[in-house]
Amino acid sequence: MAATNIYLNFQGNAAEAFNLYKSVFNTEFSAPIMRMGDMPAQEGMPQLSDAEKKMVMHVALPILGGTQIMGTDMLESMGHKLIVGNNTTISLELDSKEEADRIYNALAQGGTDCVAPHDEFWGYWGVCLDRFGIRWMFNVLNSRNA
């Protein structure tokens, strides 16, 4: 079955971020976290340091309604440079203001550029850049907000 997943890149703290997300959404990883050190050596691939071997190669976590967020740590030694920006947003359409507030409050701790959920003309809305540089948007549409 086809699916759309959200893929997030981190700079050495993917495991920490995904453990927070796991607790926020009260769910379990789809499979054990795969570490860079689990990757078989490939021709032309640079030797990984012990610290790099512990970084996340791949992690997947189901969140709401079958959506999965996935992630990795980007390694500069392999030619990947992370640039944190606002080009990735995870938009959550939630069923209640209480659920929006609970998730917002957990993700806003240590975050920046946060607008607490509040009533807008279309529903209840908020946004926050969490402490890992991931932007989250919270929506409870008026039709769900009875």
Annotate each PLM feature.
Residues A2, A31-R35, A60-I63, I69-L82, ...:
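Vicinal oxygen chelate
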